[in-house]
Each structure stands twice: as C-alpha cells, then as structure tokens.
Amino acid sequence: MAYAQDGNTIRDSLKWAITILKKSEIEFPEIDADTLLIYVLSCDRTRLYTNQDNIIDEADICKYKKLIYKRASHVPLQYITGCVEFMSLDFTVDERVLIPRPETEILVETILDKAQGNILPDKCVIIMEIGTGSGNIAVSLAKNLS
C-alpha cells in the first residue's frame, strides 16, 4: 500500500462499502465493511484505522468490491470469510455447514458445568455429538474438559 491524499484509500473504500451495505439493509454495515477489508488486506483492525489514507492496490480493491456485493446480497459474513469464532476458538465454515449460533455457547457452558461437577479423578468423560458440522461443540467441550 502507498500513501496518498485521495483515490482508492482505506477511508474511501470503507465509506463506499458502508453505503452499499446500508442500502442492502445489512444489520451492521460498519462492522461488516471493516471485517471484509481486514480479511482482504490481511491486517488487524488497528492497522486499518491508523492507515486510513493508504491506497489499496487495484487487485485488492476488486476483491473487496466482490466481497461487499456478495455480503450486500445477504450471504453471511462467516461464509464469505470462511471463519467463525465460537467460545474463543476459530472454526472453518462454508455453505455446507451451519454457522454456530451464539446461543449454542450457552449449551456448551451448561454441559461443561454439569460434566465438570461429575468428573472423578482418573476418569474420562465420554461425550458424543451427532451431526457435528463445524465441530464447534465437540472441539469446545474437548478443549475445556481436558
């Protein structure tokens, strides 16, 4: 990225994307615009916000526009980026897998509370999940029960 006063800057790109997403009635246009540009540029939020006047190269602009239009057509953000956070863990998702819902974290926390209260020393807990999908429930339980 180069420095410039105007053109295809981070600031300009975010402003454009937010406008497109608002017109499509996306619930959180600012967050989605930021997240997709972070994804395209492979940077963190701090770098995005502290380099607003940097120019984005043409290939990244094209990729970003495609992703914004995809999101504007209501494709879930997680399917676009291929990633979702669940219980502080990152999981890979695509259209073949349901996106883990925040409410499912309550289910996992409830199972953890019940299992941890019943684990005897030198005993293992066996938990079976059917229809695993992204594996978020089984992996979260395994990580927190080990």
Language model features with spans:
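SAM-dependent Rossmann-like transferase core, predominantly class I methyltransferases
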Residues: C62-S146
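N-terminal auxiliary segments of SAM/dcSAM-dependent transferases
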Residues: A2-T81
